[in-house]
């Protein structure tokens, strides 16, 4: 950490803005050019995607975490301005991160790829910005591409979102064309922040991360008042008081400053030790002079996909719990609670925003915390009434009682609303019908349609979000609310490998789908289970009735096994490689079931 500038900039000279775009429209590259133009990147810092701080982000070429940075800009007439640029993720899974970052800004640069035109996320992001009353500066990016059609892209912007085509700045993040015009547009078009530095403190937490030495570091946008070291502050949602240790700005690292006042974006360290206290979207206020009301409109993100995560080595359970708690701090949209499995031992049931989110969390756990994990099929909480009148709830298919003991089974239903362009209504309605949905209403909003369905929650858990996106080419967006429980004709399908039931692979499914799902699972499992010296039967069963079977054929005997000679170090290397592969597996009786088998259950819809 370094010491930063001490004199507070007048709010009229501050501009807080964000860059939003569809995935792959060149947002991080454009941010790099802006940083370069304003001298925020030294020669040694020059690398692509400067604001993408996670190694995983640069590898996949996507932005996952929102990263802020403070920049200084001087106009030709000598006027100095402070820009706070808050980089946001572009993938649909991370919409929550985008909405929080936008709440900290007064305006946005809306990027559109000149060769692709307006895409789904462009529209979603533009509406997010409009909902937050932000000034939109449209930028047609990648005009240097051979396939670029900047005029067409500008026209689309006007037709779809209603932004006048002549307002769009033409630019190229790669070559740096148009960057000076963008910087001028930020000063001219984006309003300075409002707010009274003398009012009681009111600051919005839009992100946070855990630092081993200072505890939780909060990323805040100060809306009213002033905050400096030694001030008493209160987290309004958590209802807890703390003393500020340090405040500062970003450049892109943390730079210690004297104070943060109305209009500024910065960070606060206040010795907050408990991860759960630092909820993103909470309001920070003075402990003695409190603001009248917290920042409105923040709701915690609702996870869409649920899955169990188990360490392959049971001794890593505590390490996994600590890692999940730390990740939760950096990712408000992720939830988890403990669960157990006979086959896999102790683990956690985790909630994610989508499959990319789930994949990234699992990858981060494995990389950053050096854990080996197995992920199970997603499920919901079922309510079972037994023949003796007893009622209990379970989300673990392994705990499901036998058919003869069940009076009735109830499953959670949701009210699902889907917004989509009218061209895709047919295929989306068909998808909802396949998922046992019943249609409630259908409303036309301009050229878009809102479908409202009542659907069993379990039906949207597997891959519904992804199927919806692919059917609608990414244009459909969904939201849901819980409706409570309803009776359903549900069955538990067990999977047996070599005549042994594997509890972690059990699924609960509607009677109408038992055969097709059982068939898909056993066929997929037979592909991924390694061949043994003997044939291995893989069966799907309901109670004692076998509904589907596949066989993993036996190896023929390896006649080369008795060969001598060969390089010993080569043999060692192969043995070592095999050992690593085995660590990813759990032993069930005599047959090893690899991680792919658990994933096969997840991807049966493909």
Curated annotation (Swiss-Prot):
Membrane topology type: Peripheral membrane protein
Domain of life: Bacteria
Record keyword RNA-binding present: no
Assigned keywords, A-Z: Cell membrane, GTP-binding, Hydrolase, Membrane, Nucleotide-binding, Protein biosynthesis
Keyword Membrane: yes
Reaction(s) the record says it catalyses: GTP + H2O = GDP + phosphate + H(+)
Location within or outside the cell: Cell membrane
Binding annotation for GTP: 24-29, 141-144
SMART domains, per the entry: EFG_C (SM00838)
Pfam families: EFG_C (PF00679), EFG_III (PF14492), GTP_EFTU (PF00009), GTP_EFTU_D2 (PF03144), LepA_C (PF06421)
This enzyme's EC code(s): 3.6.5.n1
GO cellular component terms, A-Z: plasma membrane
UniProt cross-references to HAMAP family, sorted A to Z: LepA
Function according to Swiss-Prot or TrEMBL: Required for accurate and efficient protein synthesis under certain stress conditions. May act as a fidelity factor of the translation reaction, by catalyzing a one-codon backward translocation of tRNAs on improperly translocated ribosomes. Back-translocation proceeds from a post-translocation (POST) complex to a pre-translocation (PRE) complex, thus giving elongation factor G a second chance to translocate the tRNAs correctly. Binds to ribosomes in a GTP-dependent manner.
Xref: NCBIfam families: lepA (TIGR01393), small_GTP (TIGR00231)
Similarity comment: Belongs to the TRAFAC class translation factor GTPase superfamily. Classic translation factor GTPase family. LepA subfamily.
Protein name: Elongation factor 4
Species this chain originates from: Deinococcus radiodurans (strain ATCC 13939 / DSM 20539 / JCM 16871 / CCUG 27074 / LMG 4051 / NBRC 15346 / NCIMB 9279 / VKM B-1422 / R1)
Gene: lepA
